[in-house]
Every structure is written in C-alpha cells, then in structure tokens.
Amino acid sequence: MNIHEYQGKEILRGFGVTVPKGIVAFSAEEAKKAAETLLTEQGGGVVVVKAQIHAGGRGKAGGVKLVRSADEAFEVATQMIGTTLVTHQTGPEGKEVRRLLVEEGMNIEKELYLGITLDRATSCNVLMVSTEGGMEIEKVAEETPEKLLKIQIHPTLGLQPNQAREAAFFLGLEGEQFKNAVKFISALYNAYMKADCSLAEINPLVVTKEGRVIALDAKINFDDNALFRHKDYIDLRDTSEEDPLEVEASKSNLNYVRLDGNVGCMVNGAGLAMGTMDMIQLAGGKPANFLDVGGGANPQTVQEGFRIILTDPNVKAILVNIFGGIVRCDRVAGGVIEAAKNIDIHVPVIVRLEGTNADIAQKMLDESGLNLVSAKGLSDAAKKVNEALAAA
C-alpha cells in the first residue's frame, strides 16, 4: 500500500526520524494559513508548497514551488489544486492534485539518497546510500554505480551500528553531520521494520548548513500482507490515487493490475499469471492485465473477474488459464459458464483448465452450448488467443 509524502513523514517522525515541519492543506485558503504559520515560526524566509500525489518527479512537473509569503502560497495553491500533474511515473494521463503539503524551507548544503527495501535476490533487506540525491536511483545504479553503496542487512541481526557508520562515511559526512546521519539511518531502519514497510526511501536526504540531517522527501510503502498488524495505517489509503478497476477488484479479493495490452488474463497464482503473460507476449499478443483469482476461486469471483476485465475497452480476447491444485477446475468452469450467461461477453474466450477435476470441467464447458474455445496446454492457449485476435 502506498501513502502520501506527508503521511509517511508523520509516521517517520514518530520513530525519531528528522523531518521538516509541515502542514497538509486541502484548499488554497488552508495553504495560505499554513504558510503564514510556518513563516511566522521561522521568522520569514521561504516555505515550500508540494503537490501530494502517489508519484515521483513532481518538481520537474511543476508540483513543487518555493514561496515567500502567505499570499504567494495562496496563488500557487490555487494553480495546483484541481490540476492534473503529469510526471515520468504517472503515465500520460497524470494524476489530479487534491491536497498539498506546505513545509518549512531548508538551508541546503548537500542532497543525498537513502533507501531501505527488500533485495529479493539475496532474501535480505538492503540499505542503499548515494551521494547523488534528488536523482532517480535506478539511473544512478545504471550510469554511475560507483556512487551507490548497497549494504546487506542480516535478517536476524538487523542493521548493525558499524553498517550505519559505513553508510555515513560513504556519503562523505564528518563531525556533527556524521553523528546525525548515523542516528538518522538507525531511526529509519527501526521505522522500516516496525511499520512493516516494503520500501522506505528518502530522496533527497539533505544536510543543512547548520548540520541537520533531514528527510526533504519521503516515500513509504507498506507490505499489504502485514497491514492486519497496523489497523491505523489502513485509513491512510487514498483510493483516488489508484486505478478504479484495481480498487474494485480488491473488494472481491482479486489481485488485478491494469496494463496496456489487448488480451485479458484470468489466472490462479501469481507465478502462473506471469508465465501466462509471457506466453501471450511471445505469441505476438499483449496482456491487458494481471489478474490472480487466488486459491479460493469460486463462481462468484470468476464472474467478478470477467466483469472487471471487460470494463477495459482495449480487451479484444480473454484467456482463462487455471491449474487446479487448491482450486477445483469444475468450480472455475461453473463461474465461466455463469459469467457467459449473465454478462455480455462480446470477445472470444479461450479456456485452459488442468489439474483437479479438469475432466469434469471440460465436460461442463463442452455441454454448456456456449462459444468457448478450449485449449490443451499453455502454448496452445496462447496460439488460439492470437488466432482469435487475428480473426477479430
């Protein structure tokens, strides 16, 4: 689950991570009052008005502005709220700005990078630091890997003091800045673990001329599987930032991710779903979605899956690929048949069922009288999908 920058900073503050003073605003008037409060507290200077969307690259897209007065904050907020911000992470459709973060200005000396996430290749959390703050870390890793340090964190020992010091040394910090950075890194790791995060990224991490080490920006993602331990975090979810179809699918316990292809996919199991998408691509098609109906698939979830897939106007064919281990193929077949009767399925449907009760399921499909195309094996299914696309 993703959250906004201001929400992430509030959580980090609770774990002792140093973040700027900030006030969230949902209107231009609230932004004006927030700027007035902050400017009074800091005795003038500048404050920053930041658009709050679930995407990076806001600064380059005009979503981060420096202002020197409350009236200027009002003008900037008026321009931002309600507009669509397009960045390299939003896609061409962009995201509508509905809230702002008004934050104290910083006297910046250095911009650095700090992040903690799971390294799936080593099955360990990894601490990453770079002297290239404000840059896309993927770009730094590709073009100047010598400027990025990765430190593997032992799963039972956790982040050790010497590792935090190693990271601070790599960043070229000394004296009070070094001490503050070590404390910051340790506090961020503590927050990452106790909040069950999948990502805690500070970009940029800034060092001020006064020696403060502070999170100028913060991106926090949670492990959805651990949210049952953090009921208060669930309320932070902003569904307006998510794809409406993905939100609708989650209500039926369906794992759905919308893509830009023309072949709808309904599969049980994430691994099989990814393999199915690869086969479609290799056969010449393009998957329109990732949809995992899970091990508890039943006629109702299958029908809901069809309804969600068909909401995408780009879908020209649907592939149902089920391997019946936990889920029984006849239950899935029943859902396919009911969906075909109750929903206007106006595109070809190719069905491949293997495993538990596959013979019964195939008989059900054959006797249904519906125009469903059966496939034997995944390669055959992908081939028939593309034949259907060619004939459309």
From Swiss-Prot:
<feature type="domain" description="ATP-grasp">
    <location>
        <begin position="9"/>
        <end position="248"/>
    </location>
</feature>
<dbReference type="GO" id="GO:0004775">
    <property type="term" value="F:succinate-CoA ligase (ADP-forming) activity"/>
</dbReference>
<feature type="binding site">
    <location>
        <begin position="325"/>
        <end position="327"/>
    </location>
    <ligand>
        <name>substrate</name>
    </ligand>
</feature>
<dbReference type="GO" id="GO:0042709">
    <property type="term" value="C:succinate-CoA ligase complex"/>
</dbReference>
<feature type="binding site">
    <location>
        <position position="217"/>
    </location>
    <ligand>
        <name>Mg(2+)</name>
    </ligand>
</feature>
<dbReference type="InterPro" id="IPR005811">
    <property type="entry name" value="SUCC_ACL_C"/>
</dbReference>
<protein>
    <recommendedName>
        <fullName>Succinate--CoA ligase [ADP-forming] subunit beta</fullName>
        <ecNumber>6.2.1.5</ecNumber>
    </recommendedName>
</protein>
<keyword id="KW-0067">ATP-binding</keyword>
<keyword id="KW-0460">Magnesium</keyword>
<dbReference type="Pfam" id="PF08442">
    <property type="entry name" value="ATP-grasp_2"/>
</dbReference>
<dbReference type="InterPro" id="IPR017866">
    <property type="entry name" value="Succ-CoA_synthase_bsu_CS"/>
</dbReference>
<feature type="binding site">
    <location>
        <position position="106"/>
    </location>
    <ligand>
        <name>ATP</name>
    </ligand>
</feature>
<dbReference type="GO" id="GO:0004776">
    <property type="term" value="F:succinate-CoA ligase (GDP-forming) activity"/>
</dbReference>
<dbReference type="GO" id="GO:0000287">
    <property type="term" value="F:magnesium ion binding"/>
</dbReference>
<comment type="similarity">
    <text>Belongs to the succinate/malate CoA ligase beta subunit family.</text>
</comment>
<feature type="binding site">
    <location>
        <begin position="57"/>
        <end position="59"/>
    </location>
    <ligand>
        <name>ATP</name>
    </ligand>
</feature>
<feature type="binding site">
    <location>
        <position position="111"/>
    </location>
    <ligand>
        <name>ATP</name>
    </ligand>
</feature>
<comment type="pathway">
    <text>Carbohydrate metabolism; tricarboxylic acid cycle; succinate from succinyl-CoA (ligase route): step 1/1.</text>
</comment>
<comment type="subunit">
    <text>Heterotetramer of two alpha and two beta subunits.</text>
</comment>
<dbReference type="GO" id="GO:0005829">
    <property type="term" value="C:cytosol"/>
</dbReference>
<keyword id="KW-0816">Tricarboxylic acid cycle</keyword>
<dbReference type="InterPro" id="IPR016102">
    <property type="entry name" value="Succinyl-CoA_synth-like"/>
</dbReference>
<comment type="function">
    <text>Succinyl-CoA synthetase functions in the citric acid cycle (TCA), coupling the hydrolysis of succinyl-CoA to the synthesis of either ATP or GTP and thus represents the only step of substrate-level phosphorylation in the TCA. The beta subunit provides nucleotide specificity of the enzyme and binds the substrate succinate, while the binding sites for coenzyme A and phosphate are found in the alpha subunit.</text>
</comment>
<keyword id="KW-0479">Metal-binding</keyword>
<dbReference type="Pfam" id="PF00549">
    <property type="entry name" value="Ligase_CoA"/>
</dbReference>
<feature type="binding site">
    <location>
        <position position="103"/>
    </location>
    <ligand>
        <name>ATP</name>
    </ligand>
</feature>
<dbReference type="InterPro" id="IPR013815">
    <property type="entry name" value="ATP_grasp_subdomain_1"/>
</dbReference>
<feature type="binding site">
    <location>
        <position position="50"/>
    </location>
    <ligand>
        <name>ATP</name>
    </ligand>
</feature>
<keyword id="KW-0547">Nucleotide-binding</keyword>
<keyword id="KW-0436">Ligase</keyword>
<feature type="binding site">
    <location>
        <position position="203"/>
    </location>
    <ligand>
        <name>Mg(2+)</name>
    </ligand>
</feature>
<dbReference type="InterPro" id="IPR013650">
    <property type="entry name" value="ATP-grasp_succ-CoA_synth-type"/>
</dbReference>
<dbReference type="InterPro" id="IPR005809">
    <property type="entry name" value="Succ_CoA_ligase-like_bsu"/>
</dbReference>
<dbReference type="GO" id="GO:0005524">
    <property type="term" value="F:ATP binding"/>
</dbReference>
<feature type="binding site">
    <location>
        <position position="268"/>
    </location>
    <ligand>
        <name>substrate</name>
    </ligand>
</feature>
<dbReference type="GO" id="GO:0006099">
    <property type="term" value="P:tricarboxylic acid cycle"/>
</dbReference>
<dbReference type="InterPro" id="IPR011761">
    <property type="entry name" value="ATP-grasp"/>
</dbReference>
<dbReference type="GO" id="GO:0006104">
    <property type="term" value="P:succinyl-CoA metabolic process"/>
</dbReference>
